[in-house]
Amino acid sequence: MLSSPVASTPFSVADILRLECQQKDSKTLSQWELHRNPVKPRYLRMNQESGWFESSDRAQAVPFRCTWETVLEMGSNPVGEPQTPPGTISRLGARNPMTDRGVGNLSGDMRRGGPVSTRTRPQRKSRVLFSQAQVLALERRFKQQRYLTAPEREHLASALQLTSTQVKIWFQNRRYKSKSQRQDQTLELAGHPLAPRRVAVPVLVLDGKPCLDPDVAAFLGPYKATSPYSCFGGYAGTPYDASYASRCTSASAGPGPLTPLASSGFSPGGQSAAPQGHLPATPQGVTAW
């Protein structure tokens, strides 16, 4: 089978390399022509057919052509100006970026032909200083009345040789100051609570012995009451005396003294020691159900 001849395409490696070489050669030639015949950028015009920049200066004998890259290089490095090699320092020392920025803005304004813009700060109004007599009069009126009506403000301003606006602003500032003082006092009270109150507590026991004040002992004295019950003849007029002492008896103490009920014939533990007058005696032979 016969091999077909290899057709050269514009996308082959050789064509691409050849195209790059041609572009480099044309760029070098254009730069050489530009340095040989310097022409200002304003005399360049673009040929719409070829896409190249051509010189419109008829005084030039040799026309030249350049590319977009050449124009950009011309804008960054104008022809005829000495180029400072990188790494060198000028006699005036290091360049200050802030100074360069200011000089650039100034040159731009001058180039455009407009006036140089100078930023000036707005002038602040002078602060009104009140005399001591005026301050005392304003403080006295503020204690009497925190808010003033327009006629009252006008009258006070004329009396103190001030304007109504000055009096109005002074009262506003004074109200704000008093409000801030109240808030600060509230925060101080909340941050530092009041000291705890002392409460007097009576001492009941001291060194294992009861210790009562006379006033307390009067409330804990003996309780006496007379029994008004007269349904039984034997108990008529028998006083009931129950003494509640303030001292507590120990659990191991013996039985206390007999009460009048026990002495009358009733003991708290069981039957009476002897039958009473009108109560019939229980027969010994009768058993309980």
From Swiss-Prot:
Coiled coil: none annotated. This is Homeobox protein Nkx-2.6. Keywords: Activator, Developmental protein, DNA-binding, Homeobox, Nucleus, Transcription, Transcription regulation. It holds the Pfam family Homeodomain. Not detected in any neonate or adult tissues. Residues 261-274 have a biased composition (Polar residues). Disruption phenotype: No visible phenotype; possibly due to the redundancy with NKX2-6. Mutant mice are viable and fertile. No obvious abnormalities in the caudal pharyngeal pouch derivatives (thymus, parathyroid glands, and thyroid gland), heart and gut. In NKX2-5 and NKX2-6 double mutants, the pharynx does not form properly and the development of the atrium is less advanced. It comes from Mus musculus. Belongs to the NK-2 homeobox family. Its main location: nucleus. PROSITE patterns: HOMEOBOX_1 (PS00027), HOMEOBOX_2 (PS50071). GO terms for molecular function: DNA-binding transcription activator activity, RNA polymerase II-specific; RNA polymerase II cis-regulatory region sequence-specific DNA binding. SUPFAM superfamilies: Homeodomain-like. InterPro entries: HD, HD_metazoa, Homeobox_CS, Homeobox_NK-like, Homeodomain-like_sf. The gene is Nkx2-6. It is found in: Nucleus. Signal peptide: none annotated. One of its GO terms (cellular component) is nucleus. Residues 75-125, 259-289 are annotated as: Disordered.
